[in-house]
């Protein structure tokens, strides 16, 4: 009997070491796993890469967003603060490469698009200074290439196109762009632009009904031509047809406590990864097949420490790694698929 109790205690200690990890101000970051009735633990989907980044001292401000250049193995981070680099560039294995701080006022969201030979780094800027209320395109070295919106001036206009606190964007493989505008500003809308930045369709206004928004905060696409928007203030995900902008439905049953602040799909299209800012929680949702979106179903969650505040996230489309921008903890954390060959505890 004594030997049985010793084995049981040892197993409990080992399990606690797996589930808990201290990373933020000495607080515990816990993983929420699913259990069978028989108390056998299911395989978790993601694990924290404790070795990323190698150079965390470069996080000197509030890390609002992160973007991944999957083709070239680069990770871009945008942070806010005075007299600090606004954009940091890391390798996918966590080494700091360079920083730039040109014509960036107050970054909110970012996205990387392009080819192996030419990469574009898009940043939404919500600042009130001369660079704010814009969506800007940079090359990988930080040179400004394109500006959408009226720099330093918020507005609702469509010709020319104006923004007020544009929250985030997504660029598909054809170069067409989806922008959610804005984060508490004049506009509550989803805008689709062509490759040459002409408006193809626009949906939304302030409200709670179908195709209306209250802080559209994040946007992404699935593999079957649907646009997913994190309608944060209305505590739901709204879904639209990629080509026509037709409203296809909404998920709200997963967000009774707080709305989603970020949404992305895993590369295989099986799951959505969603962040809830003030709950400091990441949720993995089961993605619907083509056709009706059905109801929201939570597969697993990762509960972070209080005040970590995951704001936006990105998924590496090649490796499946999830990078989370945490404005409270002022860091980026990387989660890798559980069965990845990358060591969980770094090198």
Swiss-Prot record:
NHL repeats lie at residues 47-93, 150-196, 200-243, 294-338. Residues 1-22 form the signal peptide. Keywords: Glycoprotein, Repeat, Signal. Glycans are attached at residues 101, 206, 278. The keyword Glycoprotein applies. Pfam families: NHL (PF01436). It comes from the Eukaryota. InterPro entries: 6-blade_b-propeller_TolB-like (IPR011042), NHL_repeat (IPR001258), TRIM-NHL_E3_ligases (IPR050952). This is NHL repeat-containing protein 3. It comes from Mus musculus (Mouse).
């Amino acid at each position: 009997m004594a030997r049985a109790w010793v084995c049981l205690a040892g197993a409990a200690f080992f399990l606690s070491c797996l589930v808990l990890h201290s990373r933020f101000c000495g607080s515990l970051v816990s993983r929420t796993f699913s259990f069978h009735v028989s108390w056998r633990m299911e395989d978790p989907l993601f694990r924290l890469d404790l070795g990323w980044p190698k150079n965390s001292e470069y996080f000197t401000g509030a890390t609002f967003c992160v973007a991944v250049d999957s083709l070239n193995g680069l990770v871009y981070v945008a942070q806010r603060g005075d007299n600090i680099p606004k954009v940091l560039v890391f390798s996918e294995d966590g080494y700091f490469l360079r920083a730039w701080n040109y014509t960036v006022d107050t970054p909110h969201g970012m996205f990387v698009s392009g080819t192996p030979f030419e990469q574009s780094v898009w940043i939404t800027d919500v600042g009130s200074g001369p660079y704010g209320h814009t969506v800007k395109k940079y090359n990988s070295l930080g040179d400004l290439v394109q500006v959408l919106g009226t720099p330093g001036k918020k507005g609702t206009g469509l010709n020319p196109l104006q923004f007020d606190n544009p929250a985030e964007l997504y660029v598909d493989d054809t170069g067409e762009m989806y922008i959610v505008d804005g984060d508490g500003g004049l506009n509550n809308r989803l805008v689709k632009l062509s490759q040459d930045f002409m408006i193809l369709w626009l949906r939304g206004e302030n409200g709670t009904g179908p195709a209306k928004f209250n802080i559209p905060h994040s946007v992404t696409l699935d593999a079957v031509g649907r646009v997913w928007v994190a309608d944060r203030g209305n505590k739901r995900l709204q879904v639209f047809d990629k080509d026509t902008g037709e409203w296809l439905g909404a998920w709200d049953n997963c967000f009774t406590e707080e709305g989603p602040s970020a949404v992305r799909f895993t590369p295989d299209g099986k799951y959505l990864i969603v962040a809830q800012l003030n709950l400091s929680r990441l949720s993995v949702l089961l993605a619907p097949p083509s056709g009706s979106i059905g109801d929201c179903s939570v597969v697993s969650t990762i509960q972070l420490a209080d005040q970590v505040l995951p704001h936006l996230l990105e998924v590496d489309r090649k490796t499946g790694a999830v990078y989370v921008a945490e404005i409270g903890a002022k860091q980026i954390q990387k989660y890798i698929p559980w069965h990845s060959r990358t060591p969980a505890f770094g090198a």
